Amino acid sequence: QAHTYRTLFPAMIKNWRKKWGTEFPFYWVQLANYMAADSLPAESTWAELREAQTMALSLSKTGQALAIDIGNPNDIHPRNKQEVGRRLSLIALHNDYGHTDLVYSGPQFRSMQIEGNKAILSFDHAESGLIAIERYGYLRGFAIAGADGKFVWAKAKIDGDKVVVWSDQIANPVAVRYNWGNNPDGTLYNAEGLPAVPFRTDDWKGITQ
């Protein structure tokens, strides 16, 4: 019921704040990577739930720590609690303890521009630069589609503070997805070592609607 979570999750936060009588900070951990990896781009209930969690950031005094890169395909609960805690602490230090110089989030999709067969992506929380972590040394995790909505794995490269995405199979791209799956393996981070937030540029009907 990931699509319903778009409504239920922020409603819960608002309800708890109402009952406590104060707009207290509310931070959470996004769903970690889990289960088998997809050999081809596919729809994913877990990806849709992660999207619903990210949407709740529209509420004031909220924050989200990612665990998309530290999960276990056979264990729903990531064992690396230290890194989860560290990422949550960055949010609290930035928002609540005056350390406004700290970068507390990985790159978050802002906008897309189409130029020929390429999609040019811009991000927030990437002021210090974008990197592909050394697991592969190149960008993974991107998929691209034309108007027919059929996604294929895409090539991607960092160009300054942007990411350029394309595929020789898609002449006229209209949508890009990143780390959209149950157990994706994307490699886009900011210079501070925080993973990019999974996203999609389309609003096509999901499998939980």
What are these regions (language model features)?
Residues 1-209:
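Catalytic-domain carbohydrate-binding cleft regions of carbohydrate-active enzymes
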